[in-house]
Amino acid sequence: MLYSKKKEFVKFLEGIYKNANTIVAIHYHGLTVAQLTQIRKDLRVSGARLKIVKNTLAKIAVANLKIKQADIFSGPIAIAYSEDYITVPKVILRFADQYPSLKVVGGFVDQKVATMNDIEQLASLATSESHKGNFLSLLQIPIRRFATVSHAPLVKLVTILKNYVNNKS
């Protein structure tokens, strides 16, 4: 890689480290191209990205931003990143269960080093979509109760009229 390209890539990585709220570093050695492509697709659907990085350039980018560095940049490393806190850990840990050769080595949350335990805790949280769904269902409860209560007198009236008609006949 040319020196100018390396400088561009370091700037690109610095942008990722600044803008992404969650970054998960993985060892991808042993994964097929199809498996990596599937991980990328699943991440892309949820608004996240996967980038294979050169360790030296990743270390330089982290050092330039004065982020405390963990020893995660060794071997074949890819970083999955997103502005969402929960998406990346959920997708990556799901694939780590599915593909034993994929190893999560650490990451960064809000430009601070995250351990495997931190990443697992983030993955166990509910997504914002599920929170929105729960909130909307809570909003519907009073409306449903009102509909049921207002519908009950009509049902009773119809039942009384049916009984009256049946008794007359």
From Swiss-Prot:
Signal peptide extent: none
GO molecular function terms attached to this record: large ribosomal subunit rRNA binding; structural constituent of ribosome
Organism superkingdom: Bacteria
Presence of keyword RNA-binding: yes
Assembly and oligomerization: Part of the ribosomal stalk of the 50S ribosomal subunit. The N-terminus interacts with L11 and the large rRNA to form the base of the stalk. The C-terminus forms an elongated spine to which L12 dimers bind in a sequential fashion forming a multimeric L10(L12)X complex.
Function description: Forms part of the ribosomal stalk, playing a central role in the interaction of the ribosome with GTP-bound translation factors.
Name this protein carries in UniProt: Large ribosomal subunit protein uL10
